[in-house]
UniProtKB/Swiss-Prot annotation:
Recorded name of the encoding gene: fur
GO function term, MF aspect, one: zinc ion binding
Name assigned to this protein: Ferric uptake regulation protein
Any GO BP annotation: negative regulation of DNA-templated transcription
Region annotation (DNA-binding) ranges: 1-83
GO CC annotations, alphabetized: cytosol
Biological source species: Pseudomonas putida
Assembly and binders: Homodimer.
InterPro entries listed in its UniProt record: FUR, Fur_C, WH-like_DNA-bd_sf, WH_DNA-bd_sf
Length: 134
């Protein structure tokens, strides 16, 4: 469970909308949410937070390093809490579902490829676009 101290550590003032949005992102099973999905979840929880406020807060959270914004092809921005753990993504092109995965062999191979070309890996973002086999 995220705490108000997370907002303070990120240099943000503790406000009710920020707390509600941060708590919602932390408690939802859906780790990748658009601003519209955030609004829907907040409304379902009986919270009255406007769309403009959600966009503003998510942008502030991104700037403060609390969330990561992803702009997957063919869709709008989705946000996930920045928990510090590296992972890659698969995006179902038929449903827009985002699946997280981590594969040590893929990570190892990427470092090897970078080293073979005389570089050091600083960061990467791997997104696989997939659909269910028929």
């Amino acid at each position: 469970m995220v705490e108000n101290s997370e907002l303070r550590k990120a240099g943000l003032k503790v406000t009710l909308p920020r707390v509600k949005i941060l708590q919602m992102l932390d408690s939802t099973e859906q780790r990748h949410m658009s601003a519209e999905e955030c609004i829907k979840a907040l409304m379902e929880a009986g919270e009255d937070v406007g769309l403009a406020t959600v966009y503003r807060v998510l942008t502030q959270f991104e700037a403060a390093g609390l969330v990561v914004r992803h702009n997957f092809d063919g869709g709008h921005a989705v946000f996930e809490l920045a928990d510090g753990g590296h992972h890659d993504h698969m995006v179902n092109v038929e449903t827009s579902e985002v699946i997280e995965f981590m594969d040590a062999e893929i990570e190892k191979r990427q470092r090897e490829i970078v080293a073979e070309h005389g570089f050091e890996l600083v960061d990467h973002n791997l997104v696989l676009y997939v659909r269910k086999k028929k």
